[in-house]
Design a protein with these regions (language model features):
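Active-site beta-loop-alpha junctions enriched in small/polar residues
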Residues: 45-47, 77-81, 108-111, 149-151, ...
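Loop/helix-junction capping segments adjacent to catalytic residues or to phosphate/diphosphate-binding pockets
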Residues: 83-86, 153, 190-193
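Short capping loops/turns at secondary-structure boundaries
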Residues: 156, 160-163, 189
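Flexible glycine/acidic-rich beta-alpha junction loops that bind and position SAM and/or redox cofactors
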Residues: 50, 154, 219
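Hydrophobic residues in well-ordered beta-strands that form the structural core
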Residues: 42, 103-105, 145, 183, ...
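Acidic/histidine-rich catalytic cores of soluble enzymes
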Residues: 73-74, 168-222
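N-terminal pre-domain/capping segments
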Residues: 2-141, 158-161, 168, 175, ...
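Active-site groove signature of glycoside hydrolases
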Residues: 136-156, 177-186
Length: 222
């Protein structure tokens, strides 16, 4: 992929049981740090076509970021991990160290909606993301990105309650590891900036934030 095409496509701004909470106590655990504000990182989704075509694997990501693009940080997509066993993660961590790469965050898809309209859905959302909190901490990432859409035409006030419940449960789990939980505007209520501000105020947690997608915001996202 040419560098120009890569930059245009990325706009880079800087199952259960595979890995459990025991990793939080592992002697190889990375210290969770936020990246420098003036640095940039590569979002793995920008290279998804090459990955799906089999040109390289997740374990190669640190090398690709350093040798092809000369950047210092990488942002993972959870669905592009092969099988995240502890041995696999150790190799990935070593690859990043060998190439001087900071692993910034993990973008999580297919793990539930942060605006589920049932208590069961809210609880399951939090449970599903726990393993990615553990993996993020092990790798030294500082955040996990989530999706928060809600049912179509959901009442915005009710949606605030649903999401606050879901994210408070997840944040309770991520707090000991100091892993931030962030929302990307990927449709539904997350495309409403006023609603997002209200959710941030309602949850009121320093580990809770946003991860704006500036490429294709909805008409109401300003």
């Amino acid at each position: 992929m040419k560098r120009r095409k890569f930059i245009e496509s990325s706009i880079v701004l800087g199952a259960a049981g595979l890995v459990g909470p025991s990793l939080l106590k592992n002697e190889l655990m990375s210290e969770t740090k936020s990246p420098p504000r003036d640095d940039i990182s590569v979002a793995q989704w920008a290279l998804v076509e090459e990955i799906r075509a089999g040109k390289w694997k997740n374990l190669d990501f640190p090398k690709i970021a350093r040798e092809d693009f000369g950047v210092n940080g990488i942002e993972f997509v959870n669905t592009l991990f092969e099988v995240p066993t502890e041995d696999y993660l150790r190799k990935l961590k070593q690859n990043a160290k060998d190439h001087g790469i900071t692993m910034v965050l993990i973008m999580c898809d297919a793990e539930g909606d942060g605006c589920a309209d049932t208590r069961e859905g809210q609880k399951q959302f939090a449970i599903n993301h726990r393993k990615w909190v553990d993996i993020a901490h092990y790798l030294g990432c500082h955040a996990v990105r989530t999706n928060c859409r809600g049912p179509q035409n959901a009442d915005k006030k009710e949606a605030l309650k649903w999401s606050a419940d879901a994210y408070n449960q997840l944040l309770e789990y991520s707090k000991p590891a100091s892993i931030s939980i962030v929302i990307e505007n990927h449709g539904g209520v997350s495309n409403d900036p006023d609603w997002m501000v209200e959710l941030m105020k309602k949850v009121n947690n320093p580990l809770f934030g946003t991860y704006p997608d500036w490429r294709s915001p909805s008409k109401e996202f300003d």
